[in-house]
């Protein structure tokens, strides 16, 4: 048996992430959402934000946010509202239906996460997160 390499570890991370993403995506589709749209709803959960703020928070282009909002707005989950003092700015508001869908979709995503790491105890989960954060640092990102 050959010794494990860094490439083996990266392959395992990629495979695990891929499987979790597929399973999470399937669970979210039952709620009519994608992982990206769930992240957007979560970004609005703490209060109204501008399109620019959401774009920056999610690290996606303003055009992508516009497309995402169009879909979520069509389903009544998000509303565009004028800024009270700056008419050039559009605020995004999570509707009551959006809040309801956020709760259901978040619960579904949490079930997937719990199943994915359910074989690990709390200490192992902490170690896993710490290791992934250390791996992400050279890439200039955070695991959280």
Task: List each model region and its residues.
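Long, contiguous secondary-structure blocks with strong helical propensity
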Residues: 2, 56-75
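Short, charged, intrinsically disordered terminal tails
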Residues: 2, 137-144
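N-terminal leader segment of winged-helix/HTH proteins
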Residues: 1-31
């Amino acid at each position: 048996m050959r010794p494990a390499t860094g490439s083996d570890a990266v392959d395992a991370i990629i495979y695990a992430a891929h499987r979790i993403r597929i399973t999470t995506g399937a669970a979210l589709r039952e709620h009519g959402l994608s992982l990206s749209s769930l992240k957007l709803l979560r970004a609005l959960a703490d209060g109204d934000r501008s399109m620019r703020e959401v774009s920056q928070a999610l690290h996606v282009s303003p055009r992508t946010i516009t497309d995402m909002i169009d879909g979520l707005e069509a389903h009544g989950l998000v509303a565009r509202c004028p800024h009270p003092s700056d008419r050039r700015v559009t605020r995004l508001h999570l509707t009551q239906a959006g809040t309801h869908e956020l709760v259901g979709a978040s619960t579904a995503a949490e079930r997937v996460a719990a199943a994915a790491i359910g074989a690990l105890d709390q200490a192992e989960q902490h170690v896993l997160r710490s290791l992934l954060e250390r791996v992400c640092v050279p890439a200039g990102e955070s695991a959280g």
